[in-house]
Amino acid sequence: MLEHLSPEIRKTLRQIKKQTLALQSIRHLNKIQKLIWFEMAMQVTGLDVNRICCNNKPINLTVYNIGDSKSSVLLCANHVNQKYFLKDIFEVKLLDEKLVNSYTI
């Protein structure tokens, strides 16, 4: 099928394939990084952590009330100032920057 395409189109398709594979690798690394940060936060705080605001390095763990239970989220420097979307903040635990850096790939 590809043999009927022009060399330019074949080259473009190869580039797209490489970019797609690179993007998949980045997404996979981002997932791994999040899991590493969740584990670090759980070890440091003793809380089960399974939410993070984005792919940026977290600076704190914000614990908030949802009805009768508590939940938590890792927040980065950008989102820490936008905590208005979290209602009923119960506690904020700062994370040591050196610790976060040591758990960053």
Language-model segment annotations:
Residues L2-I105:
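Acidic/histidine-enriched, beta-strand-rich ligand/metal-binding domains
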